[in-house]
Amino acid sequence: DAQLSRGLGDVYKRQDRANQLGFSVHEVVTLASIIEGEAMLDSERSTISSVYHNRLKINMKLQADPTIQYIIPGPPKTLSNRDLRIKSDYNTYQNYGLPPGPINNPGIASIKAALFPEDTNFLFFVAQGDGSHAFTTNEKDHEEAKRIYKINKRKNR
């Protein structure tokens, strides 16, 4: 009984936090699912969350690759520009805001990250190829981070 009460208390705390953020529980789980799809390192979940929160605040498209992977049949692949143009309510490159629902079953770490994003000004991130990401506040720095990633990828072939 004590464990059930503790578990229910956690649920209500998370629901209160979602309300503080202006999100429904469904929206929190949807955002958490994107974080789950994006984060390879637990230490980056709240930073990735901050990017999405910051984008939502300024009505910027989320441009989340996991949402594209979700709508493409088959195993994950390197995305093409054509993939980014697929017509779907889940395509966060084409649509503003969150997709209609979760794209996977997020773990508790991603749910916590969705509820408690790191306080940053980051608007962009790019994978580094080792599971980590480079986070940036503007498009110029983001393009530079992408350029460096491509150079390093070529070197490591």
Predicted regions and their residues:
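Bacterial extracytoplasmic/cell-wall-associated proteins, especially those involved in peptidoglycan
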Residues: 6-157
